[in-house]
Amino acid sequence: MENYVNENEAALLEKVIPQNSPEDLEQFWQTAITQLRAVPLQVKRKKLRTPYDKTMSTWELRVNTHDATELVAWFSCPADAKEKLPCVVYFHGGSMYKNLHHDIVATGVCCLDMDVRGQGGESVDRADYPSGNINGALMTRGLLDRNHFYLRNIYLDAIRMMDVAASLPEVDPSRIVTYGGSQGGALSIVASAFSGHSKKCYTIFSSYCCIRQRVEKGTAIFKSVNEYLKRFPEDTDRVMENLAYFDVKNLVSFLQVPTDFCLGLADDICLPQFVYSLYHHAVCEKTIMILPFTPHYSIPTTFRDRTYFEFEAM
């Protein structure tokens, strides 16, 4: 496999897409995070009964954020825990929902997993979107105003979850990591880059990178933006300018913790050249696992097992 991967990595290096970071990108996010943290954190806990109660304890958490939305998450830790433990903050893929990660907890760590707002779970999106919102499509919500765009909201929610993890009495705040694939891979990067709580970032098949190219191709969740611009071509420059503030290809420059990336050469959603461009622009300590025939929608066992051994050793 090594020769095949090396040949493909050399080809990917020639296709790296440059960053298009706005000059005020850092200030934009500093302002947004300041606004988020100006809202005092409130966490409501309720013990849950699950099929895994013999080995782990689980609570439902209801958390306030920067707007009227209430974020709902599940927090689990080993049932026999007697001291503060590491915590994996898990971010799910697009249009999925939180889960009970008994496999992660079995490594001896806690796990926190939130429902991303507006994607079918319990976190109902209460934000006011003054523009876009074509047929309820997520990526057109607030599209013309970067201060009210959907991605701004879920990125801030991801940072909020890191604040939650650091506040929980069961968690050692010095041993928090982020983990996710696709949409979750992007949120993992954002949460590790901006929260100040992360020890390490794990990101698989990261979405929300090279957004301009995804809009041009009309792939997956960005097909709605492509359709919007067909209808309103006069908004093209404004939309592309706004999207640059949320492209993790640009935001990855703020990532300072060690990060493990993973891409599949058969991925037709988050294309290999997109994910490799993201990896290329990261300035932190980093590794990348390139899997020759792995498509989207599947967290590879090889990456997962290596990561779980690291969880066990935290």
Q: Predicted segment positions?
A:
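N-terminal cap/lid segment of alpha/beta-hydrolase-fold proteins
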Residues: 35-83
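Cap/lid segment of the alpha/beta-hydrolase catalytic domain
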Residues: 102-105, 110-156
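Hydrolase active-site cap/lid region
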Residues: 185-234, 290
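Acidic catalytic loop of the alpha/beta-hydrolase fold
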Residues: 265-270, 296-297
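Short beta-strand/loop motif that positions the catalytic acidic residue
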Residues: 254-256, 261-263, 267
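Histidine-bearing beta->alpha loop at or near hydrolase active sites
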Residues: 285, 290-306
